[in-house]
Amino acid sequence: MGQYFKVHPVNPQLRLLNRAAEMVRAGGVVVYPTDSSYAFGWHMGDKAALERVRQLRGIERDHDFTLACRDLSDIATYARVENWAYRLLKALTPGPYTFVLRATHQLPKRLQDPKRRSIGIRVPDHTIAQALLGVLGEPLMSSTLLLPREQFPLTDPEDIRDRLERQVDLVIDGGSCGMDPTSVLDLSGDEVVVLRKGKGDVSAFES
């Protein structure tokens, strides 16, 4: 039976987030709120947790996941960022964007796109997500909480608990959350390519 923490959306309780971080380090799968939707989170070095999320979401092995980072310094560790891309990242983070970047050798190959050797990275603009990343002290692998046969992510934390309490280790209740996906911008080449229009404004990058 998974645990259920009610975390204050403005002043998150540090003791609860410390326990959440301990679960992640121990190989747990947690559900946490972001600025776009609720998401699964797990330690980037844990293969078993990765497989659990694949099964929960009903997705194939070639599905790309996202690395949730606290700030730009984390991004620079796991992705190669050109100067022009860095300026864009600085302007758009934190926020509802996922950026596709070329991965560095610090990132395990199983987490990279097998063909392009890239990774999707985001910096969530959400108090609880930021606090969790701060306590954890490293990025968190992340995937939208979209279940098989569902058209939209789950948004109500009590509904999430009722449906997943036997399948995840923790649900962090940060209140009702949105269901809009992030906008995805590919920065792995020489210019910005919009891969998905979502919550973040992409009008500046469309011709």
What are these regions (language model features)?
Residues 1-207:
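Active-site-adjacent structural elements in enzyme catalytic cores
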